[in-house]
Design a protein with these regions (language model features):
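Bacterial N-terminal signal peptides
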Residues: 8-20
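N-terminal, Lys/Arg-enriched amphipathic/low-complexity engagement segments
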Residues: 38-99
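Short, structured beta-strand/loop micro-motifs enriched in basic residues and often containing a Trp
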Residues: 46-56, 100-108, 213-221
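A generic structural signal for residues embedded in beta-strands
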Residues: 73, 121-124, 238
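Short, Lys/Arg- and Gly-enriched loop/turn segments at beta-strand edges
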Residues: 78-90, 129-140, 244-254, 347-349
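Intrinsically disordered, low-complexity linker/loop segments enriched in Gly/Pro
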Residues: 128-231
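Conserved mixed alpha/beta catalytic, RNA-binding, or beta-rich assembly cores of soluble enzyme
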Residues: 182-188, 195, 199-306, 317
Length: 375
């Protein structure tokens, strides 16, 4: 299944991108306005609520919510928050080896969304992101990890630097003379996946004997997407594989370039990432896709970067030829993707490489910019 549009007779909802509830993602931390009738929950990053490197579909949900409710989720940084000032590269390597096969990510969850069934789509609105004040970036020693990081062999000893974040200016100093604006987004956002699904097992060691799935690789369930467009005000669409969806998030980033070439971003933690999951019964989704105030974004992930590009373009063409804003043929969709589509390398360091293709909403002139129709 791919992103598609329900038949007009079944349409129950129109998502208008130009609604006032959408604000420009970026320096600000506010996004959509949640529905007035929704309930609000808080999920703290306690030891009971955080797992290290694995999605386990057998985990008891830490929250059970209804579609449209909002949740403020706290996150902690890699390796259960153990990477902090004073820890040197030897200590980071030791932590990496302690969780062999699993990802380095600390993930908070899972959250069960009542009514979500396999075949549905979860629309996840990112309402607000409030970072904590500490961050780091590192690349592992290329002599020990020659394939981890794009230029790993050229940096045999590895490198780590810790940063203090100015959360008023939303900036950090890289070094004297270089200041970086913060653009927080969740590097990892996932729904649960059936461990018996053959594609989920591709590329060991993505799963283990317990039926858990590593957080390391991105896939159809989202996971380690590292898509830097998922800032406050954006919306992520994920296919549902398991009853209740089962939502996790972690790998919190405060800034990342496309490619994430040295292995890590400006890795941080969130005091709060507020989300609003909504179950869409008639919106069918294959690969994750997203939207911001300005663009629709379609993703592809594969060990082969060319194949990741192909998947992203296929999703783009299918969506364009299915949308109801300005109907078009597949041939026209393919042409439009080539003329205005902006396909970017999401990341090249998560074994499964990523490409995302962005279609600007502004080209649909004089039209109400409807993201999709379905319920």
């Amino acid at each position: 299944m791919r992103p598609s549009v329900a038949a007009p007779a079944t349409l129950a909802l129109v998502l208008a991108v130009a609604l006032a509830g959408h604000t420009q993602p970026g320096k600000g931390s506010e996004g959509h306005a949640p529905a007035a009738a929704s309930k609000h929950y808080v999920l703290p990053a306690t030891p009971e609520n955080v797992q290290w490197g694995w999605y386990d579909p057998g985990e008891k949900p830490r929250l059970v919510i209804n579609s449209g409710d909002t949740v403020s989720i706290e996150t902690i940084s890699h390796s259960l928050g153990q990477i902090k000032p004073g820890l040197d590269m030897d200590g980071i390597v030791k932590l990496r080896k302690e969780n062999d096969g699993g990802g380095p990510h600390s993930i908070t969850g899972p959250i069960y969304v009542s009514g979500a069934e396999p075949g549905d789509t979860l629309e996840v609105r990112i309402l607000k992101i409030v970072p904590k004040p500490d961050a780091f970036n590192f690349n592992l020693p290329g002599k020990d990890f020659p394939t981890v990081g794009l230029l790993a062999p050229e940096f045999p000893e590895g490198f780590v630097r810790y940063y203090k974040l100015d959360l008023v200016k939303m900036q950090t100093q890289f070094k004297p003379g270089i200041v970086i604006d913060l653009q927080p987004f969740p590097g990892t956002f996932a729904v649960g996946v059936d461990p018996n699904e053959p594609d989920a097992k591709a590329g060991p060691p993505i799963h283990d004997a317990k039926g858990r799935t590593s957080t390391l690789r991105p896939w159809k369930n989202g996971s380690n997407m590292d898509l830097n467009e998922l800032q406050a005000g954006s919306t992520l669409y994920l296919p549902v594989f398991l009853k209740g969806g089962l939502i996790w998030t972690g790998d919190s980033h405060c800034r990342q370039g496309n490619g994430e070439v040295n292995l890590t971003a400006l890795e941080c933690a969130y005091k709060e990432i507020e989300i609003q999951p909504i179950v869409r019964k008639h919106l069918k989704t294959d690969w994750p896709w997203a939207e911001t105030k300005t663009d629709w974004i379609f993703m592809g992930y594969d060990e082969d970067l060319n194949q990741a590009m192909k998947i992203a373009v296929e999703q783009t063409v299918h969506w364009l030829s299915s949308q109801q804003i300005v109907p078009m043929s597949r041939e026209e969709a393919y042409a439009l993707a080539s003329i205005v589509g902006d396909c970017r390398v999401t990341q090249v360091v998560d074994i499964r490489k990523g490409v995302h293709c962005m279609i600007p909403k502004r080209v649909f002139v004089g039209q109400r910019q409807v993201a999709h129709q379905g319920s």
